[in-house]
């Protein structure tokens, strides 16, 4: 994962009062933190937007991932963390043409 994306996502969680350690190269850590703090994040994501600078692909991906997280929360995290990670990784690979 691009360091800039990881930094933005960690800031998003931090802004919501959630301390999470991005200790994997995929998005498992993110979806685990989201699921563990669903109510707190649901309220936070309704009131905030994140701007990135520079790279259009990064901006596109981060805002798309935010929308996916919001939808997942609206569905009461019905899909597993693993399924959400697979979705995010698939889209990440398509956009950035990177294989893990």
Regions found by a protein language model. Give the residues of each.
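Alpha-helical bundle regulatory/interaction domains
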Residues: 1-100
